[in-house]
Amino acid sequence: MTTKDYPSLWGFGTTKTFKIPIEHLDFKYIEKCSDVKHLEKILCVLRSGEEGYYPELTEFCEKHLQALAPESRALRKDKPAATAASFTAEEWEKIDGDIKSWVSEIKKEEDKMHFHETETFPAMKDNLPPVRGSNSCLHVGKEKYSKRPTKKKTPRDYAEWDKFDVEKECLKIDEDYKEKTVIDKSHLSKIETRIDTAGLTEKEKDFLATREKEKGNEAFNSGDYEEAVMYYTRSISALPTVVAYNNRAQAEIKLQNWNSAFQDCEKVLELEPGNVKALLRRATTYKHQNKLREATEDLSKVLDVEPDNDLAKKTLSEVERDLKNSEAASETQTKGKRMVIQEIENSEDEEGKSGRKHEDGGGDKKPAEPAGAARAAQPCVMGNIQKKLTGKAEGGKRPARGAPQRGQTPEAGADKRSPRRASAAAAAGGGATGHPGGGQGAENPAGLKSQGNELFRSGQFAEAAGKYSAAIALLEPAGSEIADDLSILYSNRAACYLKEGNCSGCIQDCNRALELHPFSMKPLLRRAMAYETLEQYGKAYVDYKTVLQIDCGLQLANDSVNRLSRILMELDGPNWREKLSPIPAVPASVPLQAWHPAKEMISKQAGDSSSHRQQGITDEKTFKALKEEGNQCVNDKNYKDALSKYSECLKINNKECAIYTNRALCYLKLCQFEEAKQDCDQALQLADGNVKAFYRRALAHKGLKNYQKSLIDLNKVILLDPSIIEAKMELEEVTRLLNLKDKTAPFNKEKERRKIEIQEVNEGKEEPGRPAGEVSMGCLASEKGGKSSRSPEDPEKLPIAKPNNAYEFGQIINALSTRKDKEACAHLLAITAPKDLPMFLSNKLEGDTFLLLIQSLKNNLIEKDPSLVYQHLLYLSKAERFKMMLTLISKGQKELIEQLFEDLSDTPNNHFTLEDIQALKRQYEL
């Protein structure tokens, strides 16, 4: 009922407020009225009492309005402010006590501040700078105009205008102006450069420093740079800040005090690495000190951060022009020196000079060396660079810049490699071994690399990059035979580019190095740093996470991941992980730690004969070959052969943690849990924080039904790396099994005894202690040789429970796919809700899994429940990789799908029609 249903026919008038007809203030009208807004107006009029006080009618209106609109604002009632009478005695005593204690604390704080002001600031009055007054203004010719002329000047004759020289008079005016603008700086000597901050709080120091800095800014803007330096110095003495150092550096540049400005810039970069203003100002000081290469580096870093910085672009062009001019001049001088060296053939220091000559990149002659030097250097012609982490080798202050040490042998910055690679490198180097002194020549890749290492250590990164580029050019024709050596050279050149600020060049070289040697730690780290410098935080995060898969104990990568995760959270919100590119899974074959027996042998037996070196190289080669064969066997799921390969590796070197963890993985795949646990124990003795060892030992304990120990190890894994989702899922599974074991211990024991007897009959004495009842799904999923380990008549079937998440479903379906068990797969589909199928499959839909699902639906499920088959086919088409899978299946598999749809069409059912089947066939591109 609305207001239009009751027109004002009786003429009783309307209310003053809202103009409501009087007859609407009635029980019957209010009871039938459904207009909430009108009822609110009526209630407002009744409460105001302008038409009389009707408590029952008001209450009735409130109840009716509450029934129609419980959230109506008109139902709210004003509540008076609480007083002491509103509380109990205990409550009021507590409130009153809190207020009194707060008042007393505030008074104490005020007294402290007052006492501090009266005690501290009088002592500082002597140290404060003078108040600016008339005496600090510019003295514009005060003495010249202070005295009155005693006699009036007589007017000049008109003839004197003929002698008037306009140019001279203009010159006098200019000189007079310069004299007038001389600033009186006598007051600067009275200002002390330091402020006494004894007894001041941090807030007061900050206030004083800010005030002095603002004074310096005023002086700088007025052109008085000396006064600006003075006030900036006072600000720094009160509280050193990046802004004050930066401003003082700019003022020093204006005064052309290059050394002071350089020191201030260095201080800024210590406090805030990567500060753009400091880099730009340090580049200016480098330019005026004729340190052009250093200026180029700083300007490149500025342009990487701010590509549109016009001042940096202009300065860089000037520096590059000066650098080209200086290089042209130095080349002319060098050529003259080389002519002198070539003329003197029998000088005593010929060897040293010719060595310098070839290091400079010119000349055709080689330095005279003993005949054995080339043979001694041959095994390490293209050795590996020393295995130092980027954070340690390149962190800290920049090394002192200077000329590289001359006359170094190729071993100075390189590890040893196999003779086969050495010979390949020598062949690629253009016959470096063809001359007696081919160990250090410019055509020798090892010599170029050694020179590059020395230049890098001395801080000459551009020259080092040139040497590495020359070595790469010599080795590239050799092809994949020396891929590892080329990868090292690309990685070294990437380090040079990273130091120079050429991040794009660094990324390109790291990509090339990773193509030649996948999952190499140094290129991954350097590429991550370059991405982070370019503010491509997502790509940097992925690279750091990949590095942590190789070595989880690397502190540099851990810190970077934590820092980047916070940045990405701020940029992309809580769902930032969804925007990342997928993190590549590092194969189990990639070792956690690098081992270099040849390097150890050289460090211990530096003076041994070449036969000992050859033995170390042979051991390393054998070890590496066996490990790679074992890794390949793991990739092929041939775990027994991989087991023997890793065991052979441990005979050569039993201190390699990665071999123990890899062999433990093989034992887990073969369900030899006790042996897997022992290998994990050995790995943890070598590296007590190894995540893989803890995780695999937890799986071994789970297989041995030691759920409590498995729980402890999984908690350690999550503590070391909370991002491992598999560990969290395993933790949930083990917790569930532990609770189940506590509840049904007698039944579990009977079941266990019965299954042990079956295992002894079927599998003999190979695995006497294997508990098959609680075999981990990971073991079943990854066991490719399932058919070979069981006889075809084996009656044991895989126990299948309803999966709760994608991980459990994936483990079960992988195990079924390995066993080709269509009946069990049909049972799994029967207990799985079709709508959950896309979520469970996730992005793991593979060809063999897809074929197994289709075969199970066709052979085992269509006769029992056609509607369930239709639902599964419908939701299977919504899986992530479904469209891609359709492009990869064979013609025979397509015919199998067509037969399934034909059987589905021939089966009558009320849950779907022929049109539905035809539409679904179009989804399957049939």
Curated annotation (Swiss-Prot):
Kindly list any coiled-coil regions of this protein.
none
The answer to whether UniProt assigns keyword GTP-binding to this entry is yes
Region spans: Disordered:
318-452, 758-801
Is the keyword Heme in the record?
no
Can you name a GO cellular component term?
Answer: cytoplasm
Q: For bias kind Low complexity, which ranges apply?
A: 369-379
Q: Where is the composition biased (Gly residues)?
A: 428-441
List where in the cell it is found: Cytoplasm; Dynein axonemal particle
InterPro entries according to UniProt: CiliaryAsmbly_MitoImport (IPR051982), RPAP3-like_C (IPR025986), TPR-like_helical_dom_sf (IPR011990), TPR_rpt (IPR019734)
Listed Basic and acidic residues bias regions: 352-368, 758-769, 784-799
Q: Return the PROSITE patterns for the record.
A: TPR, TPR_REGION
Q: Where in this protein does the record say Phosphoserine is found?
A: 347, 354, 423, 791
Placement of TPR repeats on the sequence: 209-242, 244-275, 276-309, 445-478, 487-520, 522-554, 623-656, 657-690, 692-724
Q: In which tissues is it expressed?
A: Present in most tissues, including lung, with the strongest expression in brain, colon, kidney, and testis. In sperm and testis, detected in particular in pachytene primary spermatocytes. Up-regulated in pancreatic tumor tissues and not in normal pancreatic tissue.
Q: What does this protein do?
A: May play a role in the cytoplasmic assembly of the ciliary dynein arms. May play a role in fertilization. Binds GTP and has GTPase activity.
The disease tied to this protein in UniProt is:
Ciliary dyskinesia, primary, 28: A disorder characterized by abnormalities of motile cilia. Respiratory infections leading to chronic inflammation and bronchiectasis are recurrent, due to defects in the respiratory cilia. Patients may exhibit randomization of left-right body asymmetry and situs inversus, due to dysfunction of monocilia at the embryonic node. Primary ciliary dyskinesia associated with situs inversus is referred to as Kartagener syndrome.
Q: What is this protein called?
A: Sperm-associated antigen 1
Q: Which organism is it from?
A: Homo sapiens
Q: What is the lineage of its organism?
A: Eukaryota, Metazoa, Chordata, Craniata, Vertebrata
